[in-house]
Amino acid sequence: ETFRTAPSPITFDDYRFGEHYDARLEADGWALSEFDDSGWSFAVSAPMPRGEARLCEAEPIAVRREIKPLSITPSGDGFLYDFGENCAGVCRLTVNGTAGQRIELLHGEWVKEDGTLDIERIWFHRDENLWQRDKKIVHRDVYTCHGGGTETYTPRFTYHGFRYVFVSGVTSAQAIPELLTYVVMNSDIKEKGGFICSDKTVNKLFECTRRSDLANFYYFPTDCPHREKHGWTADAALSAEHMLINLDVKNSYREWMRNICKAQADDGSLPGIIPTGGWGFKWGNGPAWDCVLAYLPYYVYVYCGETEMIKESAGAFMSYLHYLTTRVDRNGLLKIGLGDWCHVDRQSSAYVAPLEFTDTVMAFDIARKMEVMFDAVGMTAQRDFAHAVALRFKNTVREQLIDWGTYTAAGSCQTSQAMAIFYDIFEPGEKSAAFSRLMSLIDEKGGRFDVGVLGARVLFHVLAQFGKAELALKMIVGPEFPSYGFWIENGAPSLWENFRHNGRTASRNHHFWGDISSWFIQDLSG
């Protein structure tokens, strides 16, 4: 009650929709110690936000660099600014405007064939009527000028993922390069790894991965910076290793890992997004997503030699292992979550690899990694329990989901076959025959990959392990669909969410396909 308040020039702010600022409402000198606030009202007490109030040890959000526009194109009743890179942050507006002049900045990743900004992929509602309403305000920062000279405005309580900005409310004389500056922001994490070679496509793909990793790191890994901005667990798990190789993220991982453990339900289950307001326990999770619980501390241990996260999370490990044992069907298999998401040229949930295969294999890998971590901190009873759980899942897959006549994993597809090899479902003496079957599956697709995100995480590593790194490289960089090179050929400055032959994708800034950067370092360079 000792705090005083007054109407703010920030008239609206939202994490996803944007910020509105009316400079005419500014109070000169309000932040100075000698300012007279006697005319202001006392603050009103309000309930604390849900969640635990504690010091955040993750790196803060910081300005990383600034970008000037590459081009400015008249479009409709405004001007389209192209910054050439799809990153995350805000625009700094510098303008000499008139009092009451209203300037709108609409942010987007892509342009339509007619040259106008495409925001149709940034949907918030399945209800078309609600979307038609919200797209009039989504991703927009609005500034109302004070007048009387040069004004500078940078939004404070929002950020956007974008390459393009459509500016309306300015004159042609005001639509100059100095009007907008792209202020690129993300967590203040250091870049520690890198890769460059003689192949321009490889170099561009490495840059795309780095750009998507950074654009999607705001205290913790998010799925995309323009639409959901959620901490999807599988996205972070799929990228955990390559991010640790390339970026110093261990402090941020440690902080987010505490949130992951706090989000765990009493029965041991995890939600698909963290933090969550309660959503994600009944859909959007499962072993391939929940593996973030094991992967973050495991890879921090492998690459940084630290065991603090393991010790802090040991109780959550045990709860989750017990939870898995309660979710098996009568055959001992798991079929409870999301599977090989975003399979090439399919709807995201139209899996080729059977869900019972990917779920049970991922549960095996989770238990196996937890066994290693328990051993690292001397928790022998817990280690033995994790070993028993892992062995049970592995044996179940071997007994029920492998055709031993042809050494083919269930689904007879690249994802299942590569996962069975990579995660050691096949024993060493069986892997040669299993790999031959994988090569046949690749040949059936004309030498191109045909996987979702779970398959892409392992396929190229398996090919390199068996002396087929050149084939893997061709599959990655080739310009023909499907390939990462296809994205580059179609102008991608960051990693996309989907491989679609028509180039249409829900997001053009997703990091969960980014393990190719670790493949470049681990397998291509040796």
Residue ranges and their predicted role:
Residues 231-526:
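Active-site core of glycosidic bond-cleaving carbohydrate-active enzymes
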Residues 1-227, 235, 251-254, 271-278, ...:
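Extracellular/oxidizing-compartment recognition motifs
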